[in-house]
Structure formats: structure tokens, C-alpha cells
A protein has these predicted regions:
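Immediate flanking context of iron-sulfur cluster ligation sites
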Residues: 1-9
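Minor-groove-contacting beta-hairpin "wing" of winged helix-turn-helix DNA-binding domains
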Residues: 341-345
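Local cysteine-cluster metal-coordination motifs and their immediate loop/turn environment
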Residues: 10-21
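Short amphipathic alpha-helical interaction segments
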Residues: 316-330
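C-terminal scaffold of the Radical SAM
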Residues: 2, 23-47, 52-316, 337
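A short, conserved structural fragment
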Residues: 331-340
Length: 360
């Protein structure tokens, strides 16, 4: 079974207005002491030999605030298996061709740019520190630096959103050479700046659903195959790290607020960088990974839930009433079901929570 390693880099220039992830804004780099703390935790979980993960993911925060030398220290210590996917999330304004060449030489082989929109006015509304021009330059620099596996993020249903804005953003990312695109509906989180002061011009729920379906249609038309609710890829470029999450595989998350699931057990670190640096934030047990997690995560994927595997792994099977509900979903265009695999359509993915409420 594959093992994923997630390294949380909480530092960032500024907090985006929609973000409620744990982060440390106002920083221009990553202290070496923080890298040392991550190395300490790597040794905690793999004291006798390197961890050797199948995927390694630098998430944040803004992981591109790492220096290539810092990234290389962490990659070498983890010692991923040959052919491992090693991803670095990056903000366009934080990278240069030189830094990207450094990350590539350090072992990073997949770069993920947080673009969100091709319109500068929208980027300012979101609190993003980059411009569309910087995003274009970042993609071009990544290609020159030798990256072939490049992902870009798009946010949907933003304030005063239009299909034309999506088209412009897709064009920027596609022309940038992206092999993978993540497209997320804006969600107003209570603890974010938008949660405290919602922006004007937000689409209605029905309008947001229409934007999502339009995005799926256009991405598929441009050769990006949907394989998960929010993720689309050229053939062979699906994100292997996140697939470990969605297939309920083992993953180890290190850093403040990072979550793990190893051997069916969940644990996490407290969202406290100071405590993490001082080795005062040992991981906290947080329940187990069970049948509900498996069903929820598998139904995020376009391949769907294999009912035979569900029964084999967890001894679970749908009741007569649940099977009748599934057939209703099929008739409504929300799902496909061949007797052994239940998969949600794009329309079904929009109402996934309502469907899950009947299946859990």
C-alpha cells in the first residue's frame, strides 16, 4: 500500500480573505529552526530508517517560501522511493526561474500554482498578493526550469463571477502548460476574513452550481478529465498524493495542524507553531478511519464506490431502502450504478452531502 507524506509549511506573506487554514502570515521565509523541527518529527516516526514515502507534498501556508536547500534537506531525510511524486505548492509572486530550478534540482517534480483568477481586480478582492502577469510568468519559468507536471488552482463562483472570467483563467493556466487543474467553489468559512465581512456580489447557490457544471464541461472539453469533485487532469497526471487520501491509504502529516491516518488510526498536531518548534506539541489521537470515511471519500471520485470492496473491507452493504434511493439518484441523473459500482455524476457531486445523508 502507498504511503503519503505531507509537510505543512505554515508561513505566508499574508492571509487570503477566504482562507481559514492554519497559517502564520507576515513572513518572508521559513526559519531553519522550523525545518529542524520537521526533521525531528520525521525521525520520531522513522527512527531506524528513512520513511521512504511514495508521495511527498509540501502544503501550506506558502511552501515556496522555503529555499531550495531547505526543501532538499527534507526530501533527503524522507528518502522517497524511486519515481515518487514530490509536490510543492507555490504562490506565483514567490518564485523565480532560479528558485524553480533549485527546487527541481532538490527533487521536486510537481509544482502547484495558486492562480485562482486571471483578473487582477478579483485577485485583489480575494486578498491574493500576485497579479495575472506574475501567474503567467511563473508558469513560463516552471517550464524553463524543467517541470513537466504542473498544476493550477481556479476558484469558482467568486464575487460578480461570470463564465467569461472562468474562460480567461482556464486560458491562462492551459497556455501555461498545466497538466492538472483544481477547480474549487468559493466557500465562505466562518473564521475567514470573508466570513466576518462577506463580499458583495456572491452568486446564489443555483448560480454557483451552474458555474461548477460549466467548469466541468469546459475542462473536459480542453482535455482535463475529471477524476474527483474538484480535480481534473490530462491522462496520467492525476495527483497521486491526494488519491492516497481519497482511497483511505496511509498518510503522515507533520507540522502544526497537520493530520495523519496510519494503520486505521487518525492523529493530528495542535495548530501551534511555537509549541511545534519547542517539541511541546506531540500528535494527538483523533479517532479512527472507518467505513463512513471510505464511503464519503470514494464518492468524491468519479470512479465511485465499489460495493464489493466496501463489503470486503468493512463488512458493510447497502440496505434495500438504500438501494432504492440509489436507483432514484440514477433516474434523477445524479449517479450511475451497474450493480457493483456507484458513481456520482457532476450534477450528483454538487448535492453529494444530501446523497451521503441517505447512505450513511
Amino acid at each position: 500500500m502507498s504511503l503519503g507524506l505531507y509537510l505543512h509549511i505554515p508561513y505566508c506573506f499574508s492571509k487570503c480573505r477566504y482562507c481559514d487554514f492554519y497559517s502564520r502570515p507576515g513572513e518572508r521565509g521559513v526559519p531553519d529552526a522550523y525545518v529542524d523541527a520537521l526533521l525531528r518529527e520525521l525521525h520520531r516516526f522513522a527512527p531506524d530508517a528513512p520513511l521512504r514515502p511514495d508521495t511527498l507534498y509540501f502544503g501550506g501556508g506558502t511552501p515556496s517560501l522555503l529555499t531550495p536547500a531547505q526543501a532538499e534537506r527534507l526530501i533527503r531525510a524522507a528518502d522517497p522511493v524511486p519515481g515518487a511524486e514530490i509536490t510543492l505548492e507555490a504562490n506565483p509572486e514567490t518564485v523565480t526561474e532560479e528558485s524553480l530550478r533549485g527546487f527541481r534540482a532538490a527533487g521536486v517534480n510537481r509544482i502547484s500554482f495558486g492562480v485562482q483568477s486571471a483578473r487582477d481586480t478579483q485577485l485583489r478582492t480575494l486578498g491574493r498578493p500576485h497579479s495575472a502577469k506574475q501567474a503567467r510568468a511563473a508558469f513560463a519559468a516552471a517550464r524553463r526550469a524543467g517541470f513537466e507536471n504542473i498544476s493550477g488552482d481556479i476558484m469558482l463562483a467568486l464575487p460578480h463571477y461570470t463564465q467569461a472570467e472562468f474562460d480567461e483563467t482556464l486560458e491562462l493556466i492551459e497556455k501555461g502548460g498545466a497538466t492538472h487543474i483544481s477547480a474549487y467553489l468559493l466557500k465562505i468559512e466562518p473564521d475567514s476574513a470573508f466570513g466576518k465581512h462577506p463580499p458583495e456580489g456572491l452568486p446564489t447557490g443555483d448560480e454557483a452550481a451552474d458555474f461548477y457544471l460549466y467548469a466541468v464541461e469546459q475542462l473536459e472539453h480542453h482535455g482535463y478529465r475529471q477524476y474527483e469533485i474538484s480535480n481534473f487532469a490530462k491522462p496520467g497526471y492525476e495527483g497521486r498524493h491526494n488519491l492516497i487520501y481519497w482511497d483511505c491509504g496511509d498518510y503522515l502529516g507533520l507540522g502544526p495542524a497537520a493530520h495523519s491516518c496510519m494503520g486505521g488510526k487518525r492523529f493530528c498536531y495542535a495548530p501551534d507553531t511555537a509549541a511545534f518548534l519547542q517539541d511541546a506539541a506531540a500528535p494527538i489521537m483523533d479517532g479512527s478511519c472507518g467505513a463512513e470515511d471510505y464511503l464519503i471519500l470514494q464518492l468524491r471520485l468519479r470512479k465511485g464506490l465499489d460495493l464489493d470492496a466496501y463489503k470486503t473491507l468493512y463488512g458493510k452493504q447497502f440496505s434495500t431502502a438504500q438501494l432504492a434511493f440509489v436507483q432514484n439518484c440514477v433516474r434523477a441523473g445524479y449517479a450511475t450504478f451497474d450493480g457493483s459500482t456507484l458513481a456520482l455524476t457532476p450534477a450528483g457531486l454538487i448535492v453529494q452531502n444530501s446523497i451521503l445523508a441517505q447512505l450513511l
